Amino acid sequence: IRSIRRTLNHTLRKKFGRMTAEHHYFGIKPRIIAERLLPSEPAFGNSLIDYKFYCFDGNPYCCMVCYNRKSPSDVKTGLYDARTWKNIGHYVTGKYYDQHQCDIPRPASLDRMLDAAKRLSSGFPQVRVDLYEVAGNPVFGELTFTSSAGMDTGFSQEFQELMGSQISLPPAKRTQPSHPGLLGLLEIG
């Protein structure tokens, strides 16, 4: 117990996001949450299947599927159109290419997963909604606003442009610089 407590306290002191330029995490107070252990899916290796829905303002666009994740060298991935479950693995490149060796059947709870992804992603220009399926029911994993810290190289340029075209950003708000000395640096002339 003492060793676990030490490890958790050490983890809580780390500034999550510092090394990956994910500054949006800095304002969040770190917490440890203990959850019930979800059973693994023996038909697909040593872990649950992780369904990662890339969503754009409430619209699930595609789903990256990951399983067998206990060892990085054994990870398997797949890429599917979120609505039709058509395999779109031809868009996979780079680090995922060698891992793209699976054909995962359509999850029994896909319609409920899509409904959950729609509701959870509504109002966000882009967010990844991660879900699992346990006993035919969707289970929430997490919301991810910067997949792979914004440095994911696992998709082709064409697919990145297709996903990027799904984003509709609100008009930028003009604000005064937060540092008064910065105003002089921004003036021209």
Per-range role (PLM):
Residues 47, 52-73, 108-126, 131-140, ...:
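Catalytic cores of PAPS-dependent sulfotransferases
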Residues 4, 113-116, 155, 159:
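Alpha-helical structural motif
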